Amino acid sequence: MKKIFGHRGLPLTYMENSITSLNAALEYCDYVETDVRITADNNLILFHDPDLNERFIKELTTEEILSQLDNVEKDELILSSRDQIKGKVNFEIKTDSLLQPQIDILFQKMLPILHPEDIVTSFNWKSIQDFKELFSCRYGIILDHEDALFEAKSLSIHDEDMFFMVERTLLDSRHFDLPLNRTVIWTVNEKNDFVHFLDMGAFGVITDIPDTMHIYRK
């Protein structure tokens, strides 16, 4: 059966990337997708944007971040144990704005979190390549522009375990030639597109509304 990924959980119902949002989504999907960053005090935080109120997440301590969010408990955003999430996870590792030492710390802190059925991905292809031998789970790269298809194709040939998280419009490119059984398409919120991508044989589809889209899976 093709897989449904809940994009940041159920973001239209709950705070995106919150533990509550992720666990609620798992009622409807096979995986939840969530973003992971690192704080100034080296905690893993489930947070999409690189900044908060014009300061980088990497420059803020956990307490400073929580003080700027309304009524958010620490355990909703700080990932300290894999047991917080009750199903399979696609962890997207966010490294934009980080220097290499921080990137290494972020990936190293993720290693004991990962479960064998998880997928760890990033726009930082180099770090995925550098750490892939240490991952206890599947891994992949994210691409959102056509020029990236050429290098991704080469990687797909040389690494038969690599997954590809592909922005949906790239499937219309004449240069798209990635293995569909290792391709996950984002972000799909229209019924016809959802059904089409699953029918064409993609491994999975990422959606903001898994509570709706699961109805259309055959």
Residue positions per predicted region:
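Phosphate-group recognition and catalysis centered on beta-loop-alpha active-site segments
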Residues: 1-218
